[in-house]
Amino acid sequence: MWTHALSYAPAADFRFFLPAMRRLRTGPWLSWHRGATAQDVRRVVKRVRDDGPLTIRDITDDVLVDKDWLWASRKPSKLALEVAVTWGLLTVSERAGMLKTYELTDRHFGWPQPPRPATARQELAYRLDRALRAQGVVSLPSVCFHAPKLKPAVRELIEQRVRRRQLVPVDVAGVEHWATPDTLDSIPPAPDPAVVHLLSPFDPLIIQRERLERLFGYKHVFEAYVPKPKRRYGYFALPVLAGDRIVAAADLKTDRAAGKVLIQQWTPVADIVDRPAVDAALACFERFQLAAVT
């Protein structure tokens, strides 16, 4: 089961993530985990168990190493902490900006009894149901995002629900999709172009690039890792959604000293119907970015 690192997942859903966490403990290591060892993981878990919740700043006895990518830490313990989270041994109990506080999973949640891992069938149904809630209309790739091997099993479950009339086939640009009857019966009117949202590149609407392009005709590129001369939209461009169209990508930077949000680059991708609405959304975003943290 997958969610983005910057997303929230309901604690009640933890049981659906447990099977994958346990598979990671005993199966082949993920490629980005290989810089750590099982001994490293045991060491940081023991430290949290003995000393209580901690951040990477609390670990001062690491021998520093060179970074192997832009946002990596020079402290080896950082990777071990992240592996322990992926395995379900630790969780992030608090976050201040990019600084995470790590705590024992069981101690943080305080369960009277630890949740029972979902069965394979329950895990599959949860994956489909979650996609239907979030996306409304789903395809096999959108349900099986980052898990393509599950497509045959998910298709079987979908076809079973179609036979029971719990799902209805829908054609979107020649690609098979499905939706619940209630979703199709409650399709709202076209969104007002005066309703404008600045979206994160990690927003669920944006992060599945193939789905985004099919529904909106817009192909987003996250370019933080792309050399500046080769960027099209900018370092951290935010898609601008006006009504039901993406009209631009805005690469913004907050200048706190000047009390402004600067537009580093504005890339139009469609005609803007309501310019004042876009300006108002930018002003709202600026107020949010500059708001004092209490």
Give a label for each model feature.
Residues 1-294:
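Long, charged, low-complexity, helical-prone intrinsically disordered regions
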